[in-house]
């Protein structure tokens, strides 16, 4: 079977990439631009593993937030009223409108479309005009959240509710990185796109 006949995911295609450095070959070019490859990475890596989202110093106070898109998911990373760091969906549960942009500070999250308002923990607290809807319970419509944990000043998120805790996932990295005092580092420059 020729290389061109093999699936992009066929392990045989990548044997040479794991050879000793003096014998190794690079990854095939299509892994860098294939939508099929990207989709597989999203499902097998980015939706299952811990991902760095921001730094704790970017959201030092209650109400501070950073709005991000991670694997096509609109998220807001924020510090709630109790100082807990949370990762919430940035799409309103009513009509899917974008709730926030950029970064800043807020006391609540309010949708610009119909003014649904959420507490900083994601709880739906105000729904103008919904009082007329039968059987509507605000408690049934919080903002979806993803796991958020911190280490070394970094805020990590994970879309997989069953993933191992962050520190367990980091394994020996925590000890190896200890001399670098990551928690003392500060963001001094951001890449604006």
Annotate each predicted stretch with a short phrase.
Residues 72, 87-91, 98-99:
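N-terminal pre-triad scaffold of radical SAM enzymes
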Residues 79, 93-95:
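Basic side chains
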Residues 95-98, 117:
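Cys/His-rich metal-chelating microdomains
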Residues 102:
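Short beta-strand
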Residues 92, 111:
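Short cysteine-rich clusters marking metal-coordination/redox-active sites
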Residues 1-84, 105, 118-193:
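Rieske [2Fe-2S] iron-sulfur-binding subdomain
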